[in-house]
Amino acid sequence: MAAGVVFLALSAQLLQARLMKEESPVVSWRLEPEDGTALDVHFVSTLEPLSNAVKRNVPRCIIILVLQEPTPFRISVTSSCFVQNTLTKLLKDRRKMQTVQCATAQETS
């Protein structure tokens, strides 16, 4: 997990640079924590309204975690620090979910 966290810190900075240079970049990484699980992560930049009162757009990005489920998990974020924290949390949550699934499978067999 530690290697994944360091990688996320670097990738968040790269993401911010890419979003500023290109109109609609899709930046993809494959995260492979030490426990052997892997996540394909795609960052997509979009323009979303900041609020109804302020008539201007701000760059944001959508994190799409491509898991084995039919529908990707999406989160709208605004800062690279939040990108890093969110991905770290999702990796932990996924690990917890897999642990529960393994325990359930062992109980039923």
UniProtKB/Swiss-Prot annotation:
InterPro entries, A to Z: BAGE-like
Tissues in which the UniProt entry reports expression: Not expressed in normal tissues except in testis. Expressed in melanoma, bladder and lung carcinomas.
Domain of life: Eukaryota
Secretion signal span: 1-17
Main location class: secreted
Pfam families: BAGE
One cellular component term from this protein's GO annotations in UniProt: extracellular region
Note: The ancestral BAGE gene was generated by juxtacentromeric reshuffling of the KMT2C/MLL3 gene. The BAGE family was expanded by juxtacentromeric movement and/or acrocentric exchanges. BAGE family is composed of expressed genes that map to the juxtacentromeric regions of chromosomes 13 and 21 and of unexpressed gene fragments that scattered in the juxtacentromeric regions of several chromosomes, including chromosomes 9, 13, 18 and 21.
Role summary: Unknown. Candidate gene encoding tumor antigens.
Protein's name in the database: B melanoma antigen 3
Species in which this protein is naturally found: Homo sapiens
Lineage of source species: Eukaryota, Metazoa, Chordata, Craniata, Vertebrata
